[in-house]
Amino acid sequence: MLKEFREFAMKGNVVDLAVGVIIGAAFGAIVSSLVGDVIMPVIGAITGGLDFSNYFIGLSKEVTATNLVDAKKQGAVLAYGSFLTVTLNFLIIAFVLFIVIRLINRIKRSEEAKPAEAPAPTKDQVLLTEIRDILKTK
């Protein structure tokens, strides 16, 4: 059973999936940094210095804090600023994956469109062609 599992785990598809998951996690971290450290500050600067990560609605009267960390300590909050940031992360990742898949499909279509070369004739076919040509000359 252990041998069977090892064979399964070492198949190309499983290894490819593992590599894809690792690269996807790294890409997710890059996109999170892009959104949190580059895009959201620019949007905040355009909108007058607003920090979207601190946008929240207190769901109880005990929540009086002005920042999200303290508000969460005081009670339940609806942190819609964090949700906006995560949604933007998702949209960027989905768009990049869409572009990558679109490019891969375009490459596949161009490869499929190329006509396949005719296979080289076998020895029998060459011999029969020579016999035919000799018979034509007689």
Swiss-Prot record:
Coiled coil residues, start to end: none
Membrane topology: Multi-pass membrane protein
Entry annotated with the keyword Cell inner membrane: yes
Residue ranges crossing the lipid bilayer per the database entry: 19-39, 40-60, 81-101
InterPro entries for this protein: Mechanosensitive_channel_CS (IPR019823), MS_channel (IPR001185), MSC/AndL (IPR037673), MscL_channel (IPR036019)
Keyword terms of this UniProt record: Cell inner membrane, Cell membrane, Ion channel, Ion transport, Membrane, Transmembrane, Transmembrane helix, Transport
Gene Ontology cellular-component terms listed: plasma membrane
GO MF annotations, alphabetized: mechanosensitive monoatomic ion channel activity
Cysteines paired by S-S bonds: none
Domain of life: Bacteria
Cellular localisation: Cell inner membrane
SUPFAM superfamilies attached to this UniProt entry: Gated mechanosensitive channel
Family: Belongs to the MscL family.
Quaternary state and interactors: Homopentamer.
Role of this protein: Channel that opens in response to stretch forces in the membrane lipid bilayer. May participate in the regulation of osmotic pressure changes within the cell.
Name the UniProt record assigns to this protein: Large-conductance mechanosensitive channel
Gene that specifies this protein: mscL
